[in-house]
Amino acid sequence: MNTLVQDIRKSFPIFHSDHHQNLVYLDNASTTQKPDSVLNSIQQFYKEVNANVHRGLYTLGQKSTEAYEGAREKIANFISAEDSSSIIFTKGTTEAINLVASAWGDSNLNEGEEILISEMEHHSNIVPWQLLAKRKKAVLKAIPLTGDHKLDLDSMDSLLTGRTRIVALAHQSNVTGIVNPIKAISKKLQNTNAVLLVDGAQSIAHIPIDVNNLGCDFFAFSGHKMYGPTGVGVLYARKNVLNEMEPYQGGGEMIDKVTIQESTWNDPPWKFEAGTPNIAQVVGLGAAVEFLNEIGLDIIEKKLIQLTQFALEEMNKSSGIHLFHSGNPSENVISFIVKGIHPQDLAMFMNEDEIAFRVGHHCAQPLMKHFGVSATARISFAVYNTQDDIKRFIQSLKNTVEILKGHSNEKSELKTKSIPEVVL
């Protein structure tokens, strides 16, 4: 496995740059680095294939369209969608969720009906529903969390009513790494009028996705969290649901016929892709799917479990560290605080050691409120990370704690763990 990771790491040029040879990158829940195959696919498109799609009858235009639609086919296969017409390209997960809130919500949600989310959601799966609820005079409800930060499914049962029209939940938390039981939740909705949207931004790069098996109506994710380019994402939608949706934006390509007074619409997915799309980035996303398939998600998941287990073991040796984590190594995101030290101070000092990780509320302020803190530090892993990365992170963390606590009489050594939950 170590040889495999080293071979994979070689394909990521950022780690071999003169400026970043000592980089320890542990902010993968935010965005992943890009392999040569993805970068080369984008460059090759602009060098050899660049033309608009779905318009030109000339050879270059046909090749561009083939590359664009070929990426759609790859993505449909990657998530086991029924066919590629259920794949809509967006700017990312955020736009995909906003698309559903507008194109589905404005047409299907009525005054007094209900939207159900949870307290662990990223703001991108909260704010669009707030805006929709305000527009439609609907009711927004949230599933609370248990003491171990999981969805309170008993409370969910009581929150589901005959007025619930959409349930929107993360597949995996970007703060705790918890993977929600989406398939079980979808079964709860089978005899209701509610549709299910899944935010798959965190799970897409390491958990095999079968949208039919999950039982979801919508599945949204971003390219940049799965080793692909920024500025491109995907919304999967079931065909019968797509047919209930009005266009999200107006413009070229999404129309069938246009007069001065009215227009008719193209078929999905093009109905929801107005204007010139982000063609090169879509091609790059197709290359990212190929990259993941070549390695195998089972191998990636196994590696991430090993890294998470090692990190948890090392961090649990230390006092002063409080983990917001269940201890399950399949949850490959670890949020934590250090007693008496603000997460921002940790990040600033550890940056001097070229340790890159995230601090803040992680676009999940309701979850921070549940924790009783304003911010946490967070490390998250990708296929190119190694145990050496974690060792360097731990050593830098120890050194930083000693420096920041050195001015006081508090003990700076990180010894056996025994502290209460800390509120910053």
Q: Which residues fall in each region the model found?
A:
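Pyridoxal 5′-phosphate
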Residues: M1-L424
